[in-house]
């Protein structure tokens, strides 16, 4: 469709009402109930030891709304004795929630034309921002934004660990680095980095980064800081053996 996420969501809401289609965006409370179970799984995998931070990318802000709710419920049920801090990371070209956080008061000012290669968080008018704001504040957390270069480099380093994620997920690691450099996250603290999307959502991004062809919105060239450039080889076993040796 020739529209961005926010425009498409507005259209879907109209069609859902008109055609009786079930809307499963994060404005739907059942979506939040499902997403909060991610925190129960996380705690179970950590043997119910609470991390100091849970860091995740922020687009429509359903995940952070759900995570906060799930963690509060776990604490109320006596499963944990404290809440981890929630940190939301946005791409700088689509960062209305970060801007709201920096202002400290008032409502969210939508970004009309959000721009970022991290397509999963290319959202200018997140519907779940009131819930998200409550959960981040309640946890004592924070909101940060990162550049396209920071996202690209973080994605490459995640890939070096054998984990395939799409660009929006890499914003998490980029944000952790930034918050650690600023002293917001202490180097001795336990941090859970949530990667929300598989590499197959945006596989062309990898090739363009490693071949030096990746450009940010506006034509700004992304440097292949951790590039692993593909080598084109002939159909010749001797040549291939030579390269492998």
Where do the model's predicted regions map?
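Short glycine/threonine-rich catalytic loop with a Thr-x-Gly-x-Asp
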Residues: 58-62, 128, 163-169
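A glycine-rich, Thr/Ser-enriched phosphate-binding loop motif common to dinucleotide/cofactor-binding enzymes
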Residues: 25-39, 166-170
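Glycine-rich ThDP/TPP pyrophosphate-binding loop and its adjacent helix/strand module
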Residues: 36, 42, 47-69, 76
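Active-site/ligand-binding loops adjacent to catalytic centers
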Residues: 3-23, 30, 72-83, 87-165, ...
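Beta-strand segments within the central parallel beta-sheet cores of soluble alpha/beta enzyme folds
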Residues: 52-56, 81-90, 188-194
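Short glycine/serine/threonine-rich phosphate/pyrophosphate-binding segments
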Residues: 60-67, 96-97, 170-176
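Claisen-condensing/thiolase-fold acyl-transfer catalytic domains that form or cleave C-C bonds
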Residues: 148-204
